[in-house]
Amino acid sequence: ETSEKRLEKVRFMNMCMISDNKGNVLALDKVGKNYSGTTFPGGHVEAGETFIESVIREVFEETGLTIKNPKLMGIYHWISGDVRNVGFLYRTDEFEGKLISSDEGRVYWISEKDYPKKSLAPGMQQVWQIMHSDVPMECLQTITEEGIIAKIQ
């Protein structure tokens, strides 16, 4: 193999499903030019951060909550131009603080049964499936002429 095939630009991301042990999950109605719809809190991993540090920081910035012991549920990745975006998906039911929305969008508790009925952001059906799996899962999303293909394994 050529080294070109082994080397690619990568952007690390994170997302966390937070549940309150009363049948509710925390939803974020994201408002943005590039990505909008109902999702979970999360964002970019900054240089020098661990993945867990980054998800704790992002959740705090977007919700005002401090999470503890996020559990890695899987990986969701997609190609955007010449960059592979790799999202680490976590879930937790341990948190403290007061819920505060940010400029990323409104955050609120919603029942687990109602969440999938929302106008979900792209890829969130697959993220939802990964978050509810008993084993870690991976999803690769590719965009083709026929549309978006999401391969879960």
Residue ranges and their predicted role:
Residues 1-25, 41:
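Conserved N-terminal beta-strand and adjoining loop/helix that marks the start
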Residues 133-153:
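Acidic/histidine-enriched, glycine/proline-rich intrinsically disordered or flexible terminal extensions
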Residues 24-60, 148-151:
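Conserved Nudix-box catalytic region and its N-terminal flanking loop in Nudix hydrolases
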Residues 78-98, 127-131:
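Active-site-adjacent beta-strand/loop module that shapes the phosphate/pyrophosphate-binding cleft
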